[in-house]
A protein has these predicted regions:
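N-terminal acidic leader/helix
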Residues: 2-35
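Short, glycine/alanine-rich amphipathic alpha-helical segment
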Residues: 41-59
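Short, structured coil/loop segments at alpha-helix boundaries
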Residues: 2, 6, 39-46
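Amphipathic alpha-helical coiled-coil segments
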Residues: 23, 55-73
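Long amphipathic alpha-helical coiled-coil segments
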Residues: 36-41, 67-81
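General "foldedness" signal
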Residues: 26-30, 44, 51, 63-66, ...
Length: 81
């Protein structure tokens, strides 16, 4: 594979990492809201935040798997050159 294609793949990998980092930041913000709810309970908001937290966690796991698979593909391409 030519170097331009590898650079394109590495750029895509950086974007995937950015997506994962953004999702992790969302989880952190959700955790802040959940913590605030200890002082000001709101059952509906707590339930919504639990769902949002789970969805964001699932997204992080999915993106992490995609990143791992994509890194393997990049490494295989680098080796095959």
């Amino acid at each position: 594979m030519d170097e331009a294609k590898l650079e394109q793949m590495r750029s895509m990998l950086n974007k995937l990492e950015d997506i994962k980092n953004s999702q992790e930041s969302i989880i952190d913000k959700i955790n802040h809201v959940i913590t605030d709810l200890f002082q000001n309970p709101d059952k509906e908001l707590e339930k919504a935040m639990e769902v949002a937290h789970q969805n964001s966690s699932d997204n992080v796991d999915a993106i992490r798997e995609i990143i791992e698979d994509y890194e393997i593909r990049i490494n295989q391409e680098e080796i095959s050159d």
